[in-house]
Curated annotation (Swiss-Prot):
Keywords from the named record: Endoplasmic reticulum, Glycoprotein, Hydrolase, Lipid metabolism, Membrane, Transmembrane, Transmembrane helix
Active-site residues per Swiss-Prot or TrEMBL entry: 229, 316, 355
Gene Ontology MF annotations: lysophospholipase activity; monoacylglycerol lipase activity; phospholipase activity
Organism: Gallus gallus (Chicken)
EC identifiers of the protein: 3.1.-.-, 3.1.1.23
Protein's name according to its UniProt entry: Lysophosphatidylserine lipase ABHD12
Function according to Swiss-Prot or TrEMBL: Lysophosphatidylserine (LPS) lipase that mediates the hydrolysis of lysophosphatidylserine, a class of signaling lipids that regulates immunological and neurological processes. Represents a major lysophosphatidylserine lipase in the brain, thereby playing a key role in the central nervous system. Also able to hydrolyze oxidized phosphatidylserine; oxidized phosphatidylserine is produced in response to severe inflammatory stress and constitutes a proapoptotic 'eat me' signal.
Matches recorded under InterPro entries: AB_hydrolase_1 (IPR000073), AB_hydrolase_fold (IPR029058)
A Pfam family annotated for this UniProt entry: Abhydrolase_1
Main location: endoplasmic reticulum
Recorded topology in the membrane: Single-pass membrane protein
Cytoplasmic side stretches: 1-58
């Protein structure tokens, strides 16, 4: 009996000392919970690391592009030339330049002239408002003969981008026509429907060809030259050449002009992100002059002998106002203008005329009448 009791006691103690068997369900639950909790902690960390990696990769890529662009421009000066001319930007789109009436110019004729072999330029000739009714249904010969009527002529040289059918340009033609002027404008070679490759020399030669074409038909009527933005560079090139051959226009009007293309490029909003880049001039400005593009208005005005009117809006975001003012100061002190009128007309920021809306000014007709004089036909009214 004692042995049996002792064996029972030993077995009882062994059983008590042995660990209790774990519940299978409980064990499974624990084994599942622990990895799940661990994964939940790792997932946000993984997301954050992945987001940071992508952001870092984007920053490195953008930095690489930022650094590569100056070298690309330096190695390919033609890129800068295209950015100066922007002749590939044809706005407004889908207009037929052969049909100026589609732009509300019912008193306008479309011509094509050939300044050089393999170069053809599209020209618009808008007659004065007094001739609108007579112009209906007339052909090119009638319009050419009309240049000999007693109305002054304005040769308009537009800026970069777009065509002769640009909205703000068309609105200016209408204003000038209503004031009694013929308006002749054209697209330089490489712009609009004009054939050829753009260059400063080519643009200037196109303008000279159109000027001579006008003078051959306008008799003794005054011919004025009006340049806007990049067109001011063409205008001063042209007028300097005309003065050198002693056939100057009656007056030169520069709207939103700059001093020279290097200073304009340095001040242009596109250059902001690179303006303080080491070697900015070497990377960005030298390739422009390497391409033969100077448009040196500040030099040209020293050789121009005719009346000069400069119009500039203070809030111009493309050609800064101070460049127009600087050009005026150079011209006003130049000996070449000592016998001619030089006038600068600013337009206050509050008016909101910016780079291309000076035509909206109700003061513009008065400014032109006082500077150019009243067109002869208006004396009869």
């Amino acid at each position: 009996m004692r042995k049996r009791n002792e064996s029972v006691t030993v077995e009882h103690e062994r059983a008590a000392a042995a660990p209790a068997p774990l519940d299978k369900g409980c064990s499974l639950r624990h084994s599942l919970r622990l990895p799940a909790a661990d994964t939940g902690m790792k997932r946000p960390l993984g997301r954050r690391h992945g987001l940071w990696f992508r952001l870092r990769r984007l920053i490195i890529w953008l930095l690489g592009v930022y650094i590569a662009i100056p070298f690309l421009v330096k190695l390919c000066p033609a890129i800068q030339a295209k950015l100066v001319f922007l002749n590939f930007v044809r706005v407004p789109y889908f207009i037929d330049l052969k049909r100026p009436q589609d732009q509300g110019l019912n008193h306008t004729c479309n011509y094509y002239l050939q300044p050089e072999e393999d170069v053809t330029i599209g020209v618009w000739h808008t007659v004065p408002a007094a001739l609108w009714k007579n112009a209906r249904g007339k052909d090119q010969l009638w319009f050419e003969d009309a240049l000999g009527s007693s109305h002054p002529v304005i040769l308009y040289l537009h800026g970069n981008a777009g065509t002769r059918g640009g909205d703000h340009r068309v609105e200016l033609y209408k204003v000038l026509s209503s004031l009694g002027y013929h308006v002749v404008t054209f697209d330089y070679r490489g712009w609009g429907d004009s054939v050829g490759s753009p260059s400063e020399r080519g643009m200037t030669y196109d303008a000279l060809h159109v000027f001579d074409w006008i003078k051959a038909r306008s008799g003794d009527n005054p011919v004025y030259i009006w340049g806007h933005s990049l067109g001011t560079g063409v205008a001063t090139n042209l007028v300097r050449r005309l003065c050198e051959r002693e056939t100057p226009p009656e007056a030169l009007i520069l709207e939103s002009p700059f001093t020279n293309i290097r200073e304009e490029a340095r001040s242009h909003p596109f250059s902001v992100i690179y303006r303080y880049f080491p070697g900015f001039d070497w990377f960005f400005l030298d390739p422009i002059t390497t391409s033969g593009i100077k448009f040196a208005n500040d030099e040209n005005v020293k050789y121009i002998s005719c009346s000069l009117l400069i119009l500039h809006a203070e809030d111009d975001p493309v050609v800064p106002f101070h460049l127009g003012k600087k050009l005026y100061n150079i011209a006003a002190t130049s000996r070449s203008f000592r016998d001619y009128k030089v006038q600068f007309v600013p337009f206050h920021t509050d008016l909101g005329y910016r780079h291309k809306y000076i035509y909206r000014s109700p003061e513009l007709p008065r400014i032109l009448r006082e500077f150019l004089g009243i067109p002869e036909h208006e004396h009869h009214h």
